Amino acid sequence: MVSVWWLLLLGTTVSHMVHTQEQPLLEEDTAPLDDLDVLEKAKGILIRSILEGFQEGQQNNRDLPDAMEMISKRQHPGKRFQEEIEKRQHPGKRDLEDLNLELSKRQHPGRRFVDDVEKRQHPGKREEGDWSRRYLTDDSRYLDLLSDVSRRQHPGKRVPAPLFTKRQHPGKRVTEEEGDTEFENSKEVGKRQHPGKRYDPCEGPNAYNCNSGNILPDSVEELSFGL
């Protein structure tokens, strides 16, 4: 902007000098005075232009906040002060909500918060929900789980199969441990007795493998002898 005014001043001085050379001089001392007047006028014009430019710059700076206010009014009410809120937040937490939203959208609807729930649980119980969903929904997988558990247990204390207990009578269900102990006790009693004086299966301390059909004839014979 200043260079333009200097060019304008130079052009006016040159034109004035040409114009003065064409006119006859009445007095010799008037020419230097005219040059000084032109220079003073050009200086005044230059100073005036600089002041006007400075005033225009100040006016633009004053109008800038008004323009920003107008833009903020045109925006959505919930997004006017978003930048100020982000500046007040912690630098490492500004985009945390956006990141969580993106991850939740990419994940399965039923598995969006599984990681948070597992982190809040006890370290030894984090996979309990996964085992229940993985094995209890499928019978074959549940049986595989039981087989794995039974292998890790003591041979005499393995978990009985659920199908075996379901087929028994509700009042006569016995565990595998009780059956094993009764069978072992019967073997020990048989070994301690004399070969010719061993107890009948329906007699002795632990009667087993007998039914009501075998007991009724013996009771009838005893009653007949008593009569």
Curated annotation (Swiss-Prot):
Protein family (similarity comment): Belongs to the TRH family.
Write down the InterPro entries for this protein, in alphabetical order: TRH
On this chain, the residues bearing Pyrrolidone carboxylic acid are 75, 89, 107, 121, 153, 168, 193
Region (Disordered) residue ranges read 107-128, 151-204
Listed under GO biological process in this entry are: eating behavior; histamine metabolic process; hormone-mediated signaling pathway; negative regulation of glutamate secretion; positive regulation of gamma-aminobutyric acid secretion; positive regulation of insulin secretion
Q: Which GO terms describe its cellular component?
A: extracellular region; secretory granule
Pfam families, A to Z: TRH
Where does it localize?
A: Secreted
Task: Recite the UniProt keywords alphabetically.
Answer: Amidation, Cleavage on pair of basic residues, Hormone, Pyrrolidone carboxylic acid, Repeat, Secreted, Signal
Originating species:
Xenopus laevis
Name of the gene? trh-a
PANTHER family attached here? PRO-THYROTROPIN-RELEASING HORMONE
Compositionally biased intervals (Basic and acidic residues): 112-128, 184-201
Protein name stated in the entry: Pro-thyrotropin-releasing hormone-A
